[in-house]
Amino acid sequence: MLTKKYSEELEKVFSFLNEIGIAIIEKELDEATFLPGLSLGSNCIYIDSDKLLYPGDILHEAGHLAVTTTSERKLIGTQAMSSEWPTQGDEIGAILWSYAALYHLELPLEFVFHPNGYKNNSDWYISNFNSGNYIGLPLLQWMGLTLSESQAIIENKKAFPVMQKWIRD
């Protein structure tokens, strides 16, 4: 149960994440984190709203949880999780997953792909996504999360950016 009042966009994000099984937990984060105000745990995102700089980063972090296998996801935030996590593939998957979430939630791409994110390459990602160049799509399809256009036709289902499921098995 969230105790603070958040923007309409964040309330929409929190509702979506709750629906797919990713908990949002308000918590004061004393330690330094990669993204200010955010830390990951097993199927949850810890949020320190006083330190959170870019609310859209929550969706990106949710993408990391979503593209991680169930067996590894339960280790996130513990010493048992590999120091190699997330891999470059996980990063690519989380980026594309967050794009699909934005599409699903009907939020602007700049909500996640803000000017100070992605090593100042947010405009490059936005341009690629707007052109239908979905970097990492074969990976998300391999993970069983979505379908390419050609596979969607074969299976008579909707193609990416529509997701077949949001959380990897």
For the regions a language model picked out, list residue spans one by one.
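Auxiliary, metal-adjacent structural segments of Zn-dependent hydrolase domains
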Residues: 1-41, 51, 100, 104
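Short pre-active-site segment immediately N-terminal to the catalytic Zn-binding motif
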Residues: 42-57
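Catalytic and binding regions of secreted/periplasmic enzymes and modules that target cell-wall glycans
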Residues: 108-120, 124-128
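Active-site recognition of the HExxH zinc-binding catalytic motif
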Residues: 56-69
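Post-HEXXH active-site segment of zinc metalloproteases
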Residues: 67-98, 111-114, 118
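Hydrophobic (often cysteine-bearing) scaffold residues that line and stabilize catalytic clefts
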Residues: 9, 55, 90
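Pan-zinc metallopeptidase signature
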Residues: 125-169
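Short, hydrophobic/amphipathic alpha-helical patches that form generic packing surfaces
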Residues: 96-103, 144-145
